[in-house]
Amino acid sequence: MAKEILFSDNARNRLYSGVEKLADAVKVTMGPRGRNVLLQKSFGAPTITKDGVSVAREIELKDTLENMGAQLVKEVASKTNDEAGDGTTTATVLAHSIFKEGLRNVTAGANPISLKRGMDKACEAILAELKKSSKVVANKTEIEQVATISANSDSAIGKMIAEAMDKVGKDGVITVEEAKGISDELDVVEGMQFDRGYLSPYFVTNPEKMIAEFNNPFILLYDKKISSLKEMLPILESVNQSGRPLVIIAEDVDGEALATLVVNRLRGSLHIAAVKAPGFGDRRKAMLEDIAVLTGGTVISEEMGMKLETAEFSCLGTASKIVIDKDNTTIVDGNGDNERVVARVNQIKAEISNTTSDYDREKLQERLAKLSGGVAVIKVGAATETEMKEKKDRVDDALSATRAAVEEGIVIGGGAALIKASKKVNLDLTGDERIGADIVLRAISAPLKQIAINAGFDAGVVANEVEKSSNENLGFNAATGEYVDMFEAGIVDPAKVERVAMQNAVSVASLLLTTEATVSDIKEDKPAMPSMPDMGGMGMPGMM
C-alpha cells in the first residue's frame, strides 16, 4: 500500500486537527454541568454517557493522519483511567491545551526538544507542589465527598460507596453489578467467601434455606483428592471425640469417601460437610494457604512431606462460624494468628505491585480483600438498560476515584488545585526551556475553564478570580456559580488522579510537539462493482 509522508508543520497541524476533534467530543462531559454524549454501538441500543474515557474509546477518524493524533490522546485517557480510575477528561483537556500552546511556539521557531525539557521541569515542579497541598482522607465523610464528585454530584452513589468502604476497609473488594430492580442495593459479605458450595445437598443443616451452618467448626485443608475414608480415620475419630463439627476443604471428595461421609451425616454420628477447594492449579494452592493462615490451620500437602493418614489434630483450622450454600462458602472470624495474617497480606501486596498481568492483579486483589476485610457488592438499579449502563459507569468511576483518594490523599477540586500549585512554581530557566515551562503553566487552567464553559460562565473571568485569590482553598463551584472554600464545600479530587492526568498529558503533548515526520497509509478508493450484464434474450419464448 502506498504511504503518505509529511514533514514538520504540515505533519503536526494534521495531528493537531485529530487531537482537537477528540478533545472537543470529550470535554463537553466535564464538570457538574457537563453534557451527555450519545454513542452508537455496533450492536444493541445507543449508549448515553458522561464518562470521558468511554467517549474517547469510541472515536475513530476517517483521515489516517488525524486518527493518529486522536489515538495518541485516546491513549492518554485510557492510561489515566487504568492507573487512577478517573481524570480521563482532565488528562485529555490538558493534553489538547498543552499541544495547542506548544504548536504555536514551534511554528514561530522554538526548538521542540528544548520546549519538552522545560515542560517536563514545569510538570515536576507542579506535582511537587500538588503533593504538599494534598490532605489525607481521614473519615467516612471525606470518602463520601470524593465519591459524590466523581459520580457527577450524585450523593446517593457517594453515600453507598462510603458505606461499602467503611464496612470492608480500604483493601476490601467492592464490586459493581446490575440490579434486577430499579433501586440500588449494597450487599456486604463479612469474612472470607469463595465460590464453591457443598459437594452434596445431604450436608444441609437448614433445609428451609438450603444451607449448611456450623458454629465453632474444625477445618481440614487438603490439596489432593480424597477417594477413600481410610486415610482420614485418625482425624475423624479425634474430631468426633471433641463433639465439634468438621468442614473438609479439598481438591475433591468423591466415591466411597463422599458416600461414607453422607451416610454418617444422615445417621447423625458426624456433623460434617465437604467442599471443593477454590481456584485451579497454583492459585488453588495459594488460596488454600490463605484459608490456613486465616483459620490457624495447616494445609496437608505431600509436597511438604505430610500425609492425610499421619496428619496431626493441630493441623486443623478453626473459625467461629462457617455457612455453606450450593454455590458459596463463607468463613466468619477465622481463629488465625494476627501476625501471620498481616505477613500474608503484605506478601500479597508485594505480589500485586510486581505483577504485570491485569488478570493476576485482579485475582490477587480478591485474595487480599478476603484476608483483610470482606467483599461488598453494589447493585445498580435503573428503569432502562441504557440508564443502567450510564449509572454503572459513574459508580465505577466514583469507586476508582475513592480508592485513589485513600491512596494519595485529596486536593481541592474543580480544576483549582493545579492552578494553585502552578502559582507557587518558580523555575530558573532561560530561552526555549523557559517558554516550554510557561506553556505548561498557561495550559494548566484549561480544566477549570472548561468546567466554567460547560456551566455557562465566562472561562477567563472564573480562572482569573481563582488565580488571583490569596485563599489557598478557594475555587469555583460550577453547580451553584459561587466562589467557595472547596474543602468546606466538599468539592475535592484525589491527588493521584490530578498527578496521573498531568503526567500523561505532558508526556503525550511533548511527544507530539517533537514529531518531525509522519508516515501513514494512503486510503485508495476501491472501484465500484460493475453492473450485471443485460439478460435480454434469456427469457422463456412466448407460447404459440
Swiss-Prot record:
In its keyword annotation, does this UniProt entry include Kinase? no
Can you quote a single GO CC term?
Answer: cytoplasm
Name the PROSITE patterns for this protein: CHAPERONINS_CPN60
Kindly list any coiled-coil regions of this protein.
none
Q: Which GO terms describe its biological process?
A: protein refolding
Chain residue ranges for the region called Disordered: 525-544
Q: Which NCBIfam families match?
A: GroEL, PRK00013.1, PRK12849.1, PRK12850.1, PRK12851.1
Q: What is this protein called?
A: Chaperonin GroEL
Q: Name the gene that codes for it.
A: groEL
